[in-house]
């Protein structure tokens, strides 16, 4: 009976001591993994930040180009009176004195080239 108790006590002590070692190992292993995970997350975060900055730069560049060229200056369309000294006819049009039907208006009009 004593041998059974001693054996049981010995197995119990071994199990507890080995279990403690495993627990400490597990804790250290988890700390290492979390540190590696943090470094991986930092790397991923930096990579994402770089991509976002590139996209933002492209968008701002497009916005600045768009705002600079977005609206054509007001121009006069075809068949509309214009001033011969300051013609503001749209591109592809020329400010000319009318022929035939517009002679009595005594004004210049925008016509196609």
From Swiss-Prot:
| Listed GO CC annotations | extracellular region
Q: Which InterPro entries match?
A: Toxin_22
Keyword line: Disulfide bond, Ion channel impairing toxin, Knottin, Secreted, Signal, Toxin
What are the start and end residues of every segment in region (Disordered)?
61-82
Propeptide ranges are: 22-74
- Domain of life per record: Eukaryota
Question: Can you list the disulfide-bonded cysteine pairs?
Answer: 75-90, 82-95, 89-110
Q: What protein family is recorded?
A: Belongs to the neurotoxin 14 (magi-1) family. 01 (HNTX-16) subfamily.
Q: What is known of its domains?
A: The presence of a 'disulfide through disulfide knot' structurally defines this protein as a knottin.
The record's function comment reads:
Probable ion channel inhibitor.
What is the protein name stated in its UniProt record? Answer: U11-theraphotoxin-Hhn1q
